[in-house]
């Protein structure tokens, strides 16, 4: 893989990892357009550049992450369902990675977002701060996150939908989704790297580093823009986008 390809994939990863649009789907589609095969080495590269996106959340929310034990209690509780299921079902989950499943889940997720927003009602009793999330609700948001182990679902999409259904306002649901990515993606990425370390070679380090840095920069940008967007608008545009992307997937990838 060349530097240009690693930059493009880093941009795609950074922009889509924390948006409810499935970064996996975008990476598969863009890789296809670039003529890159979905080899084990290529998948290992995608896993590695996710670390750059994780670092973006740590950088932006470093104050909350380093000064709030109550926040970490909620994150750990929310991580439990995904952590257990991810460890037990690792091989099954990896076997689900197919363009067809990604396409279907993109479309289904888009329809769910539109439906949730249709019934969503803003009220004075909504949870508007992460530290006000009851522990049992944090756990159930983690259950929703577990659904995202199906490729194309979108981890952020599943957790945001879970948050909205459990009474969080849009901004709080989005921020909790970002923060929950830290333990979740750190564990998943670390496990994947341990499983696929033999695919990382010295000659690939420049491309890996380039993709990592690019993903970090664009993830910072995406998170800031996304929080500004959901503070004023709803998630319907993302639902529509997912449906369109799902059909594009069916045309170009299958």
From Swiss-Prot:
It catalyses: di-trans,octa-cis-undecaprenyl diphosphate + H2O = di-trans,octa-cis-undecaprenyl phosphate + phosphate + H(+). Its main location: membrane. GO terms for cellular component: plasma membrane. GO terms for molecular function: undecaprenyl-diphosphatase activity. GO terms for biological process: cell wall organization; peptidoglycan biosynthetic process; regulation of cell shape; response to antibiotic. The chain crosses the membrane at residues 1-21, 41-61, 75-95, 96-116, 130-150, 174-194, 210-230, 234-254. It is a multi-pass membrane protein. It is an enzyme of class 3 (hydrolase). The keyword Metal-binding does not apply. Coiled coil: none annotated. The keyword Cell wall biogenesis/degradation applies. It is found in: Cell inner membrane. Keywords: Antibiotic resistance, Cell inner membrane, Cell membrane, Cell shape, Cell wall biogenesis/degradation, Hydrolase, Membrane, Peptidoglycan synthesis, Transmembrane, Transmembrane helix. Catalyzes the dephosphorylation of undecaprenyl diphosphate (UPP). Confers resistance to bacitracin. HAMAP family: Undec_diphosphatase. This is Undecaprenyl-diphosphatase. It comes from Persephonella marina (strain DSM 14350 / EX-H1). The gene is uppP.
């Amino acid at each position: 893989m060349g530097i240009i390809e690693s930059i493009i994939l880093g941009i795609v990863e950074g922009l889509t990892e924390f948006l409810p649009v499935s970064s996996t789907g975008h990476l598969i589609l863009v890789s296809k357009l670039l003529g890159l095969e979905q080899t084990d080495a290529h998948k290992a590269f995608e896993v590695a550049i996710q670390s750059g996106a994780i670092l973006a959340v740590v950088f932006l929310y470093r104050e909350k992450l380093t000064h709030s034990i109550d926040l970490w209690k909620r994150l750990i509780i929310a991580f439990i369902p995904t952590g257990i299921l991810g460890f037990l079902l690792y091989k099954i989950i990896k076997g689900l990675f197919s363009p067809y499943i990604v396409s279907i889940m993109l479309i289904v997720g888009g329809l769910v977002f539109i439906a949730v927003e249709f019934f969503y009602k803003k009220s004075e009793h909504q949870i508007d701060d992460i530290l006000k999330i009851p522990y049992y609700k944090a756990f159930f948001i983690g259950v929703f996150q577990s659904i995202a182990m199906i490729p194309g679902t979108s981890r952020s999409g599943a957790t945001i939908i879970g948050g909205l259904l459990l009474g969080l306002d849009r901004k709080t649901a989005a921020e909790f989704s970002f923060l929950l990515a830290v333990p979740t993606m750190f564990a998943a990425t670390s496990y994947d790297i341990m499983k696929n370390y033999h695919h990382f070679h010295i000659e690939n380090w420049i491309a890996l580093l380039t993709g990592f840095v690019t993903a970090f920069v664009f993830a910072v940008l995406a998170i800031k823009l996304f929080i500004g967007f959901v503070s004023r608008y709803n998630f319907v545009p993302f639902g529509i986008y997912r449906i369109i992307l799902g059909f594009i997937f069916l045309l170009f990838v299958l």
